[in-house]
Amino acid sequence: MSDIIYALKSKKSNIGLKIESSLRHDEFGVNFFASSDVALDTCELNVENIELLIKEIQLSDNFDNVIIDGRFSFGKDMYVLMDGFNECIFVSDGSPSSNVKFQNAYKCIGILDRQYGGSLAGKIKVIYNRFSSRSSETMENGEITILGGIKRIEGAKPAELVEQIMENTFLDEIG
């Protein structure tokens, strides 16, 4: 990913070629980029860099769905970027504190929708990760689509985790 970030920031390289050369594949047919060599590299990306990266990824035709794992922000740039997506899937553990935080964020998104004339709130869906019947609960909000949950899996190897996750049929509803 560091090479792609450098290409995006320098604007001197062919981003499409850099994406193609950096693409990795796993045994499950998932295409992905390796983590950055230095974690701070990703902090240097601005919204324009991310938009360009997404456009180049879409042009490459190597992905059915694009997953962006990043921090949530209420800034206008990030809002406009997220509103351009077909779906925005948030992941929560279903703990009471996580549910309250998500509900508050969802209310803020509704306000931003009205301010900017967008429709992000209607694109939001939730997946529960590490869901436990003892410490987790689903949100009671008829406006938010809850796709499903992935139970807590202790001590599993990465391949075992992927197998368990892929057994969830709700993942077919993404995209």
Q: Which positions does each model-derived feature cover?
A:
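Conserved catalytic-core segment of NTP-binding enzymes
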Residues: 52-65, 70-146
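NTP-binding/hydrolysis catalytic cores, primarily Walker-type P-loop NTPases
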Residues: 151-175
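Phosphate/oxyanion-binding active-site loops and adjacent basic polyanion-contact surfaces
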Residues: 46, 98-101, 162, 166
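Conserved P-loop NTPase mechanochemical-coupling segment
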Residues: 29-41
